[in-house]
A protein has these predicted regions:
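Bacterial N-terminal signal peptides that target proteins for export
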Residues: 1-11
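Active-site region of chymotrypsin-like
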Residues: 87-90, 94-98, 129-155, 193-195, ...
């Protein structure tokens, strides 16, 4: 393949690892956060909230755009129309509304855990009002995020279970209206503990009001497979699920002489290799979820992309603009 191997600054934050010890807890059964379980009945059109699309003069309301992945913003390429905008989560439709069309659905945690962030000011994030819950699993911490809430009924530090209400489904945040009200759900790995220092180095001119639970610091994977497991009461294994995700590109980063902190948080990511590596090779999905970390005896002075899966169009379209080049 032909590619520049350029490593974009936004990805460098993923490689800034900080101390966090794993917690030895049990796996969980992931539950749906609202009464809408249409996905279990093979009715995705009744589960995912559509977006209003106008592509080349043709208007549509595809429910697929409410699913996880590269599902939004079509562009025409030599390979045909390609959705290039990443949607880091799933948008779940409401089931109940009052006479004015305002949704009435309660939002519950997908599993028991601790509220680590509750942002009740809708102007502080594109998420609008949102809540983040930490779930301690055998493989390390899992984070669930619930966004665009009409109201928040929990606070940081609360211990919650699936029977608790953490908020109301709504349409707070950017680009939403009452008709398209939904709850945006993410399941995530946390990338850094000292996110604030990295964020400050970007000099974006806007304060980080969300600490380590800013969306930039949470690498979200598709929640749908985890939700589908609950039909049979199957437990969700974080390590098994992450290990099954497809790798899109691999980054080599210099070793600092100690185990990367991401590996300390998620030990299952570590693969066999030299005991005293000169660098680390981190495999990522196209959406930026780390899948594995492998010790390497190859020296390097700065992070760089060393491999990427070929595509018939720009790598930018399948790596959230993190990797340049094409196949």
């Amino acid at each position: 393949m032909s590619m520049h191997g350029k490593f974009f600054p936004s990805l460098i934050g993923i490689l800034l690892f900080f101390w966090s010890m794993p917690f030895l807890m049990a796996d969980i059964v992931v539950r749906f956060p609202t009464e809408n379980t249409a996905l279990l009945d093979n009715r995705p059109q009744d589960f995912y909230m559509y977006v209003d699309r106008n592509f080349e003069g043709k208007k549509s309301q595809p429910w697929e755009a409410g699913a996880y992945g590269f599902t939004r913003t079509l562009v025409r390429t030599q390979a045909g129309p390609v959705a290039v905008k990443f949607h880091e989560g799933i948008d779940i439709k409401p089931l109940r509304r009052d006479a004015s069309g305002t949704p009435l659905d309660d939002v519950h945690p997908v599993a028991g855990g601790t509220v680590v962030h509750a942002s009740a000011n809708p102007t502080h994030s594109n998420y609008g009002r949102y809540v983040v819950i930490e779930h301690q699993l055998a493989d390390g911490p899992l984070y669930s995020l619930y966004a665009h809430l009409a109201s928040v009924s929990c606070k940081e530090g609360d211990r919650v279970g699936t029977g608790n209400v953490i908020g109301k489904l709504g349409y707070s945040g950017v680009g939403l209206n009452k008709t398209r009200a939904h709850v945006h759900l993410e399941l995530c790995l946390k990338l850094q503990d000292d996110f604030e220092n990295w964020y400050s180095s970007l000099k974006l001119g806007t304060p980080n009001r969300h600490g380590a639970y800013n969306g930039l610091n949470l690498a979200g994977f598709d929640p749908a497979p985890a939700l589908m497991q609950c039909k049979d009461g199957a437990e969700f294994s974080l390590s098994r699920h992450i290990s099954s995700l497809p790798v899109q590109y691999v980054v080599r980063a210099p070793s600092t002489g100690s185990l990367p902190n991401l590996v300390k948080r998620y030990p299952f990511l570590l693969k066999p290799g030299p005991a005293n590596p000169k660098s680390w090779e981190i495999s990522f999905t196209g959406t930026g979820v780390p899948v594995s970390v492998t010790p390497s005896d190859q020296p390097c002075t700065e992070p760089s992309v060393i491999r990427a899966v070929p595509h018939p169009f720009s790598q930018l379209y399948r790596t959230c603009n993190r990797v340049s080049g094409s196949s």
